[in-house]
């Protein structure tokens, strides 16, 4: 999901909320502009009810959306960036065969992402990041579009402006 997070976050001086949910808790941080950087204003953490999240997917949508909406209302922030739960993402570190053009490498990376989730490329979002060193290695990260759409719907139901949905942050921890 190609969100230009840095650009979206930098375009306004409004406060920004960041949400990270695990299988049993949620953490919401509020950042405010401090010149050219961001300053931590608030940090809230609360437990999630059993069944609200199941394997990175939203299991009980309405109570989770209501809780998120109330938490955001308490902060007064409407702009939100979220990290997908680690269980919602797949990742792998792959060694690239040598001598390939950019187009051939891109097609290979796409096939690898589709193989990770065992789904057609049209059913997922993916990204690849070159790792330093030789031989050339890539970290491929992906999530299914239906999971991404669930999380985008959660932000919409909570009444916030989603400026970033990050699978890279979570999936990179699995690699």
Give the ranges of each region predicted by the language model.
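Short glycine-rich phosphate-binding loop at a beta-alpha junction
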Residues: 16, 68-70, 75-87, 155, ...
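Gly/Ser/Thr-rich loops at beta-strand to alpha-helix junctions
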Residues: 25, 86-89, 145-146
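Short, surface-exposed recognition loops or helix-turn segments adjacent to catalytic cores
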Residues: 123-131, 160-175
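N-terminal phosphate-binding loop and adjacent alpha-helix
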Residues: 42-72
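Internal amphipathic helical hairpin motif
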Residues: 61, 84-141
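Gly/Thr-rich phosphate-binding beta-strand-loop-beta motif of the actin/hexokinase/Hsp70
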Residues: 2-47, 80-85, 175
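A short alpha->loop->secondary-structure connector
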Residues: 35-40, 97-109, 156-162
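Ligand-binding face of N-terminal immunoglobulin V-set domains in extracellular IgSF glycoproteins
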Residues: 139-153
């Amino acid at each position: 999901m190609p969100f230009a997070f840095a650009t979206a976050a930098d375009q306004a001086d409004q406060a920004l909320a960041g949400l990270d949910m695990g299988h049993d808790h949620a953490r919401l941080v509020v950042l405010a502009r401090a010149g050219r950087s961001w300053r931590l204003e608030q940090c809230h953490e609360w437990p999630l009810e059993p069944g609200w999240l199941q394997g990175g997917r939203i299991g009980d949508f309405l109570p989770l959306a209501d809780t998120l909406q109330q938490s955001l209302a308490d902060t007064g922030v409407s702009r939100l960036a979220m990290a997908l739960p680690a269980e919602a993402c797949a990742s792998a570190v792959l060694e690239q065969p040598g001598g390939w053009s950019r187009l051939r490498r891109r097609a290979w990376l796409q096939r690898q992402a589709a193989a990770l989730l065992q789904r057609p490329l049209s059913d997922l979002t993916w990204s690849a990041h070159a790792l330093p060193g030789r031989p050339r290695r890539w970290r491929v990260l992906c999530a299914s579009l239906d999971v991404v759409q669930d999380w985008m719907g959660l932000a919409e139901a909570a009444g916030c402006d989603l400026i970033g949905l990050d699978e890279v942050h979570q999936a990179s921890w699995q690699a």
